[in-house]
């Protein structure tokens, strides 16, 4: 179940930092905000959280999540999930990135949208 109050607190903190969107990838933070608990290991798990609009969850089909709580973009190990994220983010606005997102995902996103402002954020999902 989507944790709307928790998301609203994170959105308020984003606005306070001048951000309008964020990629949350720490599995515990994703669980805290969505109720979806998976351990991705080396695979991509991400929650795109805009300050306005619907969040988008990016999940590998290997993860057993029968009823995701929000819009979900599924991928497999042979897909390019960063390209899927690149289609959702607003490249003209600063993007907050949580502290856990590996460079193997962040760098390709930045290469897809050169010049997109990216901010490492100290926000905690609480």
Residue spans for each PLM region:
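Terminal domain-start leader segments
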Residues: 1-54
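General beta-strand structural signal in soluble alpha/beta enzymes
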Residues: 22-25, 97, 117-120
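Structural motif
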Residues: 25-27, 59-61, 97-101
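Compact, glycine/acidic-enriched structural inserts
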Residues: 59-73
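Short, aromatic/basic amphipathic alpha-helical patches
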Residues: 68-69, 105-113
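Short acidic-hydrophobic, aromatic-tinged amphipathic segments that line or gate anion-handling sites
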Residues: 71-81
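Hydrophobic alpha-helical hairpins/lids featuring a short glycine-rich hinge
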Residues: 84-88, 92-103
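Conserved small/polar residues in nucleotide/adenosyl-binding loops
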Residues: 121-126
């Amino acid at each position: 179940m989507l944790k709307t109050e928790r998301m609203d607190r994170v959105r308020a903190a984003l606005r306070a930092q001048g951000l309008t969107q964020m990629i949350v990838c720490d599995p515990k933070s994703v669980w805290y905000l969505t109720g979806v608990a998976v351990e991705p290991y080396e695979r991509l798990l991400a929650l795109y959280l805009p300050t306005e609009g619907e969040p988008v969850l990016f999940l590998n089909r290997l993860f057993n999540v029968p009823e995701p709580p929000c819009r979900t973009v599924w991928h497999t190990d042979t897909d390019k999930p960063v390209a899927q994220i690149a289609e959702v983010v607003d490249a003209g606005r600063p993007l907050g990135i949580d502290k856990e997102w590996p460079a193997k995902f962040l760098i390709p996103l930045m290469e897809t949208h050169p010049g997109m402002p990216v901010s490492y954020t100290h926000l905690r999902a609480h």
